[in-house]
């Protein structure tokens, strides 16, 4: 039984280990050399998780939610005369479009249904037709539904057509193996409170050094200037430009150590995959069908279609919370769904307990 009051079956914030929580019981100074050395270690560890070609990449940590880091990239990487192609099939792709529009960046959209992956044929057609496109952005795991998008194919097109590639790997990095050098990803974005299993408070950008250097002077925001943030961390040994979330950084460092102890990203992926497979099998036994086709389904979060007309999600939510579980409502408009996350400090025995509770007739009518 997990020691938390509630087991969060969500895509982040998520259930963390007791040891991750415990390191936040102490106070830390942002100017302390030991703390800044830890920041540098975190940055280096993230690059080593992302690629074998570590010398080509660097990490920028950015205060705030993961969305802050996405906006830092969109607002800093694309020049005034640039044009962004966004692949969208959910809320987080749409959010990138909204950012670009608010920042007055020219944007082209390749949109598919929320339960369908990015259409590679359409993406290539847009690249062929619009020579002004300079950058491509795609969400790896769209947690609106739990679908995985074909970033390998998107990045191949980016390389083929000479575009800068931006991958929002918010809910996949650390839980699904990615080598950003092999894929020729220029900017990868994620967050502390996802598959690394830290707590909310900062996001991070793993950037190709050559591309990051081109961003100098392009920032459209003071606090979200990606280049300036990186330059300060580089020149001042891990110093953040503005107050950093010291407790969150320590928790994240501990979470990185625990990821290594678990056996790395592949071992964590296997646990998440087994959680998700068990969840779908057991939920199927009691009448719940997943929204996303299994060939596109991530191990991160699963959307389930309401089992019958008149099903009340709030009843399910309240009952599960009474049993110590917290799940997510659906986030799409065309199909009634709810979502169950498979990541965090969650194990097969937790999934079995969850479905046992759902199987009790009170929560499904």
From Swiss-Prot:
GO terms for molecular function: 2-aminoethylphosphonate-pyruvate transaminase activity. InterPro entries: Aminotrans_V_dom (IPR000192), NH2EtPonate_pyrv_transaminase (IPR012703), PyrdxlP-dep_Trfase (IPR015424), PyrdxlP-dep_Trfase_major (IPR015421), PyrdxlP-dep_Trfase_small (IPR015422), SP_NH2Trfase/AEP_transaminase (IPR024169). Its cofactor is pyridoxal 5'-phosphate. The modification N6-(pyridoxal phosphate)lysine is found at residue 194. It holds the Pfam family Aminotran_5. GO terms for biological process: organic phosphonate catabolic process. It catalyses: (2-aminoethyl)phosphonate + pyruvate = phosphonoacetaldehyde + L-alanine. Keywords: Aminotransferase, Pyridoxal phosphate, Pyruvate, Transferase. Its EC number is 2.6.1.37. Gene3D superfamilies: Aspartate Aminotransferase, domain 1 (3.90.1150.10), Type I PLP-dependent aspartate aminotransferase-like (Major domain) (3.40.640.10). Involved in phosphonate degradation. HAMAP family: PhnW_aminotrans_5. Belongs to the class-V pyridoxal-phosphate-dependent aminotransferase family. PhnW subfamily. Homodimer. This is 2-aminoethylphosphonate--pyruvate transaminase.
């Amino acid at each position: 039984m997990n020691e938390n009051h509630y087991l969060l079956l969500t895509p982040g914030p998520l259930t963390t280990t007791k040891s991750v929580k415990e390191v936040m019981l102490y106070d830390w100074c942002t100017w302390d050399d030991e703390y800044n050395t830890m920041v540098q270690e975190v940055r280096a560890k993230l690059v080593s998780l992302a690629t074998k070609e570590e010398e080509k990449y660097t990490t920028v940590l950015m205060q705030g939610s993961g969305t802050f880091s996405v906006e830092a990239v969109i607002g800093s990487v694309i020049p005034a005369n640039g044009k962004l192609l966004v692949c969208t099939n959910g809320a987080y792709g749409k959010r990138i479009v909204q950012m670009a529009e608010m920042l007055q960046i020219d944007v082209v959209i390749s949109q598919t249904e929320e339960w369908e992956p990015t259409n590679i044929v359409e993406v290539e057609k847009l690249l062929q037709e619009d020579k002004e496109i300079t950058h491509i952005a795609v969400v790896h795991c769209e947690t609106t539904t739990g679908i995985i998008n074909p970033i390998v194919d998107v990045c191949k097109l980016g390389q083929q057509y000479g575009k800068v590639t931006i991958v929002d790997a918010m809910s996949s990095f650390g839980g699904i193996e990615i080598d950003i050098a092999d894929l020729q990803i220029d900017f990868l974005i994620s967050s502390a409170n996802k598959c690394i299993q830290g707590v909310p408070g900062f996001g991070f950008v793993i950037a190709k050094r050559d591309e990051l250097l081109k961003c100098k002077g392009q920032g459209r925001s003071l606090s979200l200037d990606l280049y300036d943030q990186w330059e300060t961390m580089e020149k001042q040994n891990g110093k953040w430009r503005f107050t950093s979330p010291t407790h969150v950084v320590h928790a994240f460092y501990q979470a990185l150590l625990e990821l290594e102890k678990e056996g790395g990203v592949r071992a964590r992926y296997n646990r998440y995959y087994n959680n998700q497979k068990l969840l779908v099998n057991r939920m199927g036994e009691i009448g719940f069908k997943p929204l996303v086709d299994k060939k596109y389904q991530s191990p991160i979060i699963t959307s389930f279609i309401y089992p019958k007309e008149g099903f009340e999600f709030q009843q399910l939510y309240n009952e599960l919370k009474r049993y110590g579980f917290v799940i997510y409502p659906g986030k799409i408009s065309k199909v009634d769904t709810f979502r169950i996350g498979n990541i965090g400090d969650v194990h097969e025995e937790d999934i079995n307990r969850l479905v046992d509770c759902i199987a009790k007739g009170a929560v499904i009518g």
